[in-house]
From Swiss-Prot:
HAMAP family: CobS (MF_00719). The keyword Transmembrane applies. This is Adenosylcobinamide-GDP ribazoletransferase. Its cofactor is Mg(2+). GO terms for cellular component: plasma membrane. Joins adenosylcobinamide-GDP and alpha-ribazole to generate adenosylcobalamin (Ado-cobalamin). Also synthesizes adenosylcobalamin 5'-phosphate from adenosylcobinamide-GDP and alpha-ribazole 5'-phosphate. The gene is cobS. InterPro entries: CobS. It is found in: Cell membrane.
Length: 248
């Protein structure tokens, strides 16, 4: 029951998919529950894959790609894209660490945020539109998993950057190497089942990009925040799609 509870907590927090009943979780439940973030990614990917098979019967590939991107944003509520924008606003402001963190918490949208979100969305659309239709279902199934493993790696491999409370504190303080290993096993198994040896190589590569991305951001502000976890998720999805396209 504990694991089911944590899975449902992750579904409720990381997506806009309705959970049929209210679940109260502790800080530990959220932090340890991030192990199941790849499972949530697989759920998102499964919905997108089913939607793809429906949409392709009625629309050309270009329109289908736009609708799939829109569906992804609706499924996640734009949570990770918001983190991406806030992170780029702060990190690339070229200010002090304290000022960067202050900018990231500011609800106003800056130029760097707009550019980052637009570039990632357009690049994802271009990649999805360029992948052959025969391979697209597998890409759709796995790219959200790659993104969520990025958030897990980010939470488990660094410290919380802020003093006081914040959205990502529970995840970062209660998540560690053990959770990364457990979530990584899920990621590698799913990737192997979907893409065979190629899946293992892509999983290994995107685990590495996760570590590299979070270390870059953490080096700027002294750790990670909820926004940074969202940014790593979105960037890792794009890295996965790039690699999938290159090695299609």
């Amino acid at each position: 029951m504990k694991y089911l509870k944590r899975i449902l907590l992750m579904v409720g927090f990381l997506t806009r998919i309705p959970v049929p009943f209210k679940i109260d979780g502790t800080e530990e439940d959220y932090g340890k529950g991030l192990v199941f973030a790849p499972v949530v990614g697989l759920l998102i990917g499964g919905i997108l894959t089913i939607l793809f098979y429906i949409l392709k019967r009625f629309f050309p590939p270009g329109v289908t790609g736009i609708l799939l991107i829109a569906a992804y944003i609706m499924l996640t509520g734009g949570l990770h894209l918001d983190g991406l924008g806030d992170t780029f606003d702060g990190i690339f402001s070229n200010r002090s660490r304290e000022k960067m963190l202050e900018i990231m918490r500011d609800s106003r949208i800056g130029t760097n945020a707009v550019l980052a979100v637009i570039c990632v969305v357009i690049l994802n659309y271009a990649l999805l539109s360029s992948i052959p239709l025969s391979g697209l279902p597998k890409a759709l199934l796995l790219f959200p998993v790659a993104g969520r493993i990025g958030s897990l790696v980010g939470a488990g491999s660094t410290v919380y950057a802020r003093e006081g409370e914040g959205l990502g504190k529970s995840f970062i303080n209660c998540c560690g190497i053990k959770e990364i290993l457990q979530g990584g096993i899920i990621y590698f198994i799913v990737s192997l089942l979907v893409l065979n040896i190629k899946g293992l190589l892509l999983a290994a590569a995107t685990m590495i990009t996760s570590f590299a991305t979070v270390k870059f951001f953490a080096g700027k502000v002294g750790g990670a925040t909820g926004d940074i976890l969202g940014a790593v998720c979105e960037l890792n999805q794009t890295f996965f799609l790039i690699l999938f396209y290159l090695f299609k």
